[in-house]
UniProtKB/Swiss-Prot annotation:
Keywords, comma-separated and alphabetical: Allosteric enzyme, ATP-binding, Cytoplasm, Hydrolase, Magnesium, Metal-binding, Nucleotide metabolism, Nucleotide-binding, Phosphoprotein, Transferase
Name by which UniProt lists this protein: Cytosolic purine 5'-nucleotidase
Matching Gene3D superfamilies: HAD superfamily/HAD-like
Biased composition (Acidic residues): 550-560
Residues the entry annotates as binding IMP: 52, 54, 202, 206, 215, 249-251, 292
An example Gene Ontology molecular-function term: IMP 5'-nucleotidase activity
Family per similarity comment: Belongs to the 5'(3')-deoxyribonucleotidase family.
Upper lineage: Eukaryota, Metazoa, Chordata, Craniata, Vertebrata
Source organism per UniProt: Bos taurus
Length: 560
């Protein structure tokens, strides 16, 4: 007879983790199939699965798609008067990464941490360090909330733009026809500030996306630019069996239809042998022209799309949800009303940390799944270059050994210069494994602004949402403990506390003291017999009262 889990939980010795120190690892999926957890999420509570299209359902091939966007933007700049020489530039995917900040005053690309501390500074293709950096950033720090000056390049669509900004700054700084200035460049009596140059690039990028030929060229060669995954119909059909599925994209219907038709263009349906189904059949609700992030606030007028012509029908749609109907505009409130769902019932899956994740989380309370395609390469470096990480750990041990027997009475000063140089060299080698700007998530031991945003706003994240295929819909995604240095570097072993060295250590706050202190408290209050407050002292909770991030708030309410 098999022992049930509830019985095994009664005996800690039978817990799987106690059978083997590293037992948890054998229960984990393969790294490239994993979904990573910032906040616990019970999948069985999710009633609706929402999707963005661009870079989520439709993953664009890299660097082919970025190269196309780069070329079209350069052509647009040349057409409005920028030098012909710019046409010689080609997109280099090894340079940019997401999450960089462009300083519109000095023309620098900056990689910063969550607090605005500089991690990397590049002026064009020139990486600036030390005293040169401090001339422009005295404390190696920026005010991130100065959005007039600093622009965060957070999206995958920003990658070509990021590299183009570096190309332009480098060109105008080094081309002998122009005179480089601190905040821009001169051509004779004409001055162009980096702020003006940046605005020209922003306008050119928007023109390429909304008025130019980017979408036209994409649909002309979908096989070249769009990833097609045979597991997509299977996952969406399984989602539809356990809940409702909706699409909310900023793209117009004609483009959406062509992309989605290609993604579901298989001779079979969800499984080999099943009949082919049109892409619309996999969704309960389809919204185009969503205009996110406005969609998560006041939104826009909800209208109905004529799928034969792609044009919008006049008037605001006010009826119930109809299967097979495509809607334009609307808002996140519209989604909740039409699907009969509320905030935490919905898991929204997207790639845009601001337009998809931050706004859906902060304004609607939707659960969030961030798609980070770069994670596949980040994991490859993390595992393939493990020797570099191990060497850094060894160097830390060498440092600890040098200081092991020294305290404040020691006059000895160990020479750690060679170890410091080696740490810098290994850290640099590790950074370069990711690309010229280093990892998307860190610079050495410090996490980037992008990493902090992922941890703050994304409940779940993965290289692809297809990874949900490898988990049951009853799965509890449980967040790991986020350890502080005093927790991650101190072993779980008993330590005898010296009360003289640490007087506050005697301030034992655990409930085991309560019985002992009852008598002391009685001694303090025994003379007060006539008038007493309703409760003289707090009592230790006998039931769970703290929020432990187990995604079980509703279950607790039901139990009450």
């Amino acid at each position: 007879m098999t022992t049930s889990w509830s019985d095994r939980l009664q005996n800690a010795a039978d817990m799987p983790a106690n059978m083997d120190k590293h037992a948890l690892k054998k229960y984990r999926r393969e790294a490239y199939h994993r979904v990573f957890v910032n906040r616990s999420l019970a999948m069985e509570k999710i009633k609706c699965f929402g999707f963005d299209m661009d870079y989520t359902l439709a993953v664009y091939k890299s660097p082919e798609y970025e190269s196309l966007g780069f070329e079209l933007t350069v052509e647009r700049l040349v057409s409005i008067g920028y030098p012909q020489e710019l046409l010689s530039f080609a997109y280099d995917s090894t340079f940019p990464t997401r999450g960089l900040v462009f300083d519109t005053l000095y023309g620098n690309l900056l990689k910063v941490d969550a607090y605005g501390n500089l991690l990397v500074c590049a002026h064009g293709f020139n990486f600036i360090r030390g005293p040169e950096t401090r001339e422009q950033y005295p404390n190696k720090f920026i005010q991130r909330d100065d959005t007039e000056r600093f622009y965060i390049l957070n999206t995958l669509f920003n990658l070509p733009e990021t590299y183009l900004l570096a190309c332009l700054v480098d060109f105008f700084t080094n081309c002998p026809r122009y005179t480089s200035c601190e905040t821009g460049f001169k051509d004779g009596d004409l001055f162009m500030s980096y702020r003006s140059m940046f605005q020209d690039v922003r306008d050119a990028v928007d023109w390429v996306h909304y008025k130019g030929s980017l979408k036209e060229k994409t649909v002309e060669n979908l096989e070249k630019y769009v990833v097609k995954d045979g597991k997509l119909p299977l996952l969406l059909s399984r989602m539809k069996e356990v809940g409702k599925v909706f699409l909310a994209t900023n793209s117009d219907y004609k483009y959406t239809d062509k992309i989605m038709t290609y993604l579901f263009d298989f001779p079979h349906g969800p499984k080999p042998g099943s009949s082919h189904r049109p892409w619309q059949s996999y969704f309960d609700l389809i919204l185009v022209d969503a205009r996110k992030p406005l969609f998560f606030g006041e939104g826009t007028v909800l209208r109905q799309v004529d799928t034969k012509t792609g044009k919008l029908k006049i008037g605001t749609y006010t009826g119930p949800l109809q299967h097979g109907i495509v809607y334009s505009g609307g808002s996140s409130d519209t989604v909740c009303d039409l699907l009969g769902a509320k905030g935490k019932d919905i898991l929204y899956i997207g790639d845009h940390i601001f337009g998809d994740i931050l706004k859906s989380k902060k304004r609607q309370g939707w659960r969030t799944f961030l798609v980070i395609p770069e994670l596949a390469q980040e994991l490859h470096v993390w595992t393939d270059k493990s020797s570099l990480f191990e060497e850094l750990q060894s160097l830390d041990i060498f440092l600890a050994e040098l200081y092991k027997h020294l305290d404040s009475s020691s006059n000895e000063r160990p020479d750690i210069s060679s170890i410091q140089r080696r740490i810098k060299k290994v850290t640099h080698d590790m950074d370069m494994c990711y690309g010229m700007m280093g990892s998307l998530f860190r610079s050495g031991s410090r996490q980037t602004l992008f990493a902090s945003q992922v941890m703050r706003y994304a409940d779940l994240y993965a290289a692809s949402f297809i990874n949900l295929l490898y988990y049951p819909f009853s799965y509890l995604f449980r967040a790991a403990h986020v350890l502080m240095p005093h927790e991650s570097t101190v072993e779980h072993t008993h330590v005898d506390i010296n009360e003289m060295e640490s007087p506050l250590a005697t301030r034992n706050r655990t409930s085991v003291d309560f019985k002992d202190t009852d008598y002391k408290r009685h001694q303090l209050t025994r003379s007060i017999s006539e008038i007493k407050p309703p409760n003289l002292f707090p009592l230790a909770p006998q039931e769970i009262t703290h929020c432990h991030d187990e995604d079980d708030d509703e279950e607790e309410e039901e139990e009450e």
